[in-house]
Amino acid sequence: MGKLTGKTALITGASQGIGEGIARVFARHGANLILLDISDEIEKLADELGGRGHRCTAVKADVRDFASVQAAVARAKETEGRIDILVNNAGVCRLGNFLDMSEEDRDFHIDINIKGVWNVTKAVLPEMIKRKDGRIVMMSSVTGDMVADPGETAYALSKAAIVGLTKSLAVEYAQSGIRVNAICPGYVRTPMAESIARQSNPDDPESVLTEMAKAIPLRRLADPLEVGELAAFLASDESSYLTGTQNVIDGGSTLPESVSVGV
């Protein structure tokens, strides 16, 4: 039996990147999956995992729209009966200098990275409270609360907010049997990281990823499956005394005082 056997997990932003990695790890640990995404690609992953014998349901929704989220959660519960674990993973990042960033791009981060998390949590939490049992895993970042990079002001703002939300929910609903913890990844080899690299250097994005890796003590970007294993730990009984925590998985990237050429 896996550490998540018999549990049903709703994972947002699951069609690619970290969300896909979490879905694959959760399936390996025995969870029943509800994969929520705005992209049609979510059906492909659900079909693949289902074809391998995992119980997996895909639901389409825009996390910015509370009515859309409510409808998706209702459809999912018709299939699975309940949601034991929520992984708020859906997120975006667009580079832009603070003074040059449009209100549209600013709100794009706020609407998905903050309001989206708020909406999905609000739709799922009441039934967890009724059962007095639930695990919520938030996807924050080292960016925002710990470090900052030029061009990522809106992203940093949104991810720092998730830390505050995590701690507040952990305190507010601890007596209801709900545990809430955040994951703070550094650079992970995902379509988002590749998009940031293309925005930084359209002519040679791979060189940007190479430089990212050089600045990390472990000299590589994380694999989404590694983040998935941390999420599985936080969603399982193995972390039964953890709530309100920030769990950094960054290969040591936040350790150096400055980037060095090495010795």
From Swiss-Prot:
InterPro entries: NAD(P)-bd_dom_sf (IPR036291), SDR_fam (IPR002347)
Active site (record annotation): 155
Gene Ontology molecular function: any one: oxidoreductase activity
Keywords: Oxidoreductase
Binding site for NAD(+): 10-32
Binding site for substrate: 141
Domain of life: Bacteria
SMART domains per UniProt: PKS_KR
EC number, UniProt record: 1.-.-.-
Family per similarity comment: Belongs to the short-chain dehydrogenases/reductases (SDR) family.
Name of the protein: Oxidoreductase UcpA
Gene: ucpA
